[in-house]
Regions:
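Conserved short loop/helix modules at catalytic or binding sites
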Residues: 48-98
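GIY-YIG nuclease catalytic motif and its immediate N-terminal context
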Residues: 1-53, 81
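Charge-rich alpha-helical segments
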Residues: 30, 74-76, 80, 128-133, ...
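Conserved aromatic-histidine-acidic binding/catalytic patches
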Residues: 43, 74-82, 151-158
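Generic detector of well-ordered alpha-helical segments enriched in charged/polar residues
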Residues: 23, 52, 56, 87, ...
């Protein structure tokens, strides 16, 4: 079994005062983190290298008016690849969990490639998810979510390498047919 990195989830009111508290975290600025904004109905998942600045930006965004709380997921071992991957996984799983309606317009910046200690971050994600259940930000365990139809067919789901290659081939062939005027093979 891969190593599990220790994480902490710090929660604050989604307000100017809460943003100031984020600023004073040891990793509130200049450190990669993942965060969740939530109200009673909606949530937003993001990642940033400056939580204080990013929360400030969200406070000015009218789309986030219904948010009441910010949860910052911190880890000493976090790096940009890991936070992008965790963000992507959170969006996929929270969408399928259905506790909140996500305001995310996409699945985050997917990490298709391998990165250092990726298996350890997958184990770490499982621990993060358990903490989110304890905090009321998630309801179902990962096994139940990953076996649900909504997760399997989610629009947030990352394509497999084989699926990605098929999409690229289809786009290439369609482009070629359009450029040559061969409408029969579109």
């Amino acid at each position: 079994m891969a190593e599990i990195f220790e994480t902490v989830i710090e929660q604050f009111k989604f307000s100017d005062g809460g943003a100031e508290k984020v600023k004073h975290l040891s990793k509130g600025e200049n450190w990669p983190v993942v965060y969740i904004l939530n109200g009673s109905k909606y949530a937003y998942v993001g990642e940033t290298n400056n939580a204080y600045r990013r929360i400030g930006q969200h406070l000015k965004n009218e789309k986030r008016n219904s948010m009441k709380r910010v949860s910052i997921i911190l880890g000493d071992e976090f790096n940009k690849s890991a936070t992008l991957d965790i963000e992507n996984k959170l969006i996929q799983h929270m969408h399928a969990d259905r506790v909140f309606i996500l305001q995310n317009e996409n699945a985050g910046q997917s990490v298709r490639n391998n990165y250092y200690q990726k298996e350890a971050y997958e184990q770490t994600f499982q621990e993060i998810w358990k903490k989110l259940i304890e905090l009321g930000l998630a309801k179902h365990n990962l096994y139940a979510i990953r076996n649900s139809e909504i997760f399997k067919y989610s629009p947030y789901k990352e394509l497999t390498e084989e699926q990605f290659e098929c999409v690229e081939l289809l786009l290439k062939l369609t482009g070629r047919s359009l450029s040559t005027g061969d409408k029969e093979n579109i």
